Amino acid sequence: MTNDRLFAGIARVLSVRPLAAALALLLTLPLIGVQAQSLRPSSGLRLPTPAASAGAAAGSASGQRQADFIVAVVNSEPITNSEVRTKLVRTEQQIIQQGSPLPPRRELVPQVLERLISDKAQLQLARSAGMRVDDNAVEAAVQTVARQNQISVDELRRRLKADGIAYSQFESDLRDELLVSRLRQREVDLRVTVTEQDIDQFLREQEGGTELSSLALNLAQILVAVPENATPGQVAALQAKAQQVMDKARGGADFAALANEFSDSPTRGTGGLMGLREADRYPPLFVESTKSLKVGGLAGPIRSGAGFHILKVIEKRQAGMPGSVITQTHARHILLRLSPKQGETAATEKLAALRKRILAGQADFAALARENSEDASAKQGGDLGWANPGMFVPEFEKVMNGLAPNQISDPLVSRFGVHLIQVLERREAQMSQRDQREMARNVLRGKKQEEAYVLWAQEVRGRAYVEYRESPQ
């Protein structure tokens, strides 16, 4: 279960060309969800403020004031220059962390503005449809951000303040992301269907092919970031740290747990997973390092402009074609369904209390699942058995994939209700023909969802009234 592009198998990806990389990234930036709100421990939050961005450009208080002018109006709501600057710097940071070269700002800025316009139009549509995200869902998202960065909520507040970011604005941004993500689920994802004929045709089309252009990879990474202007001594120390992490991975340590503990990449909260992509849409450095590896193989540390990367091959197959070896997950969950008598806030609070009892050793997960879960798995203590990739809805699977064995998630909301998830173990397994067809179904569903989303987003954007404003002289 994953959401906004939360379908791990078909995530939008970076091209090897700088501008194409930026455009592909822009398609995922606004709704990447709370897992992308990552902090880099060495430097605090990597989320620049409008004032900081403007100050870097103008270097004066007057420059900061100038950054507040309106650059566009979307159905009467303004987009300011400071918003564009903030989104621009975030985009550039993520491009760098992905190991791709930066395009010129003169090419990137117009695309950032257009993305902000599209996001604004979608947010307005969600609000006009009466969709809401309650305070408890936002607080759960904040806790997820803190947990993924291995800090407390109080420490998160401190880092936000140190970087000049108002906590209220941070919460507002999370609320907007959750709201538009739910709109996409309702308007796009749930309306996509895949027929048996679609699967048959897909499998026929994907048979054969050995060229790099037909190869698909699903990689996970751990990034040990190297700051700009680092001294040779600092670089050597960070390289040694990366090598130590690599040694742990080769020694059998869980890669997702290592990513959560050591990685400076935004993917740390999801176990380092970067999603299934055509090989030529990964950075060439990553492809060269992993193309000869088998599933489960490790590469690194590899040096890029962002730092030192450690890579693991999660899946490897012909593009779009289910592979023969997959990573299965054994998990269990507690589900509380939403109803007039049990709203999202109440369900989330109840599951948070159950999680606290389990972590304190006061209760057993399976016993609580039998007593409280409203899923068919309750009788089995919430046990979901061994699951192949794509078996659960995206918003569920995204969180599950980011958990290390025995780790328990925070309460998360899916289209079925509110869940508490615990991953028990993982293994690599050979897929049956039935499993391959199911995998093909999920790949097709993801592709169709992406195609449908692009068309839907264009329609929403096309219906919006947009007025561009000239910058003050």
UniProtKB/Swiss-Prot annotation:
List the disulfide bonds in this chain: none
Q: Which GO terms describe its molecular function?
A: peptide binding; peptidyl-prolyl cis-trans isomerase activity; unfolded protein binding
A Pfam family in this protein? SurA_N
Question: SUPFAM superfamilies from the xrefs?
Answer: FKBP-like, Triger factor/SurA peptide-binding domain-like
Which GO biological process categories is it annotated with? Gram-negative-bacterium-type cell outer membrane assembly; protein folding; protein stabilization
Which reactions does this protein catalyse? [protein]-peptidylproline (omega=180) = [protein]-peptidylproline (omega=0)
Its annotated compartments are: Periplasm
Concerning InterPro entries, the annotation shows: OMP_Chaperone_SurA, PPIase_dom_sf, PPIase_PpiC, PPIase_PpiC_CS, PPIase_SurA, SurA_N, Trigger_fact/SurA_dom_sf
Task: State the EC number(s).
Answer: 5.2.1.8
Main subcellular location: periplasm
Q: Which UniProt keywords apply?
A: Chaperone, Isomerase, Periplasm, Repeat, Rotamase, Signal
Q: Which residues form the PpiC domain?
A: 214-315, 326-425
Entry's PANTHER family? CHAPERONE SURA (PTHR47637:SF1)
| HAMAP family listed in its UniProt record | Chaperone_SurA
Briefly, what is this protein's role?
Chaperone involved in the correct folding and assembly of outer membrane proteins. Recognizes specific patterns of aromatic residues and the orientation of their side chains, which are found more frequently in integral outer membrane proteins. May act in both early periplasmic and late outer membrane-associated steps of protein maturation.
In the UniProt entry, what is the domain comment? The PPIase activity resides only in the second parvulin domain. The N-terminal region and the C-terminal tail are necessary and sufficient for the chaperone activity of SurA. The PPIase activity is dispensable for SurA to function as a chaperone. The N-terminal region and the C-terminal tail are also required for porin recognition.
Question: What is the protein name for this chain?
Answer: Chaperone SurA
Annotated organism of origin: Polaromonas sp. (strain JS666 / ATCC BAA-500)
Gene responsible for this protein: surA
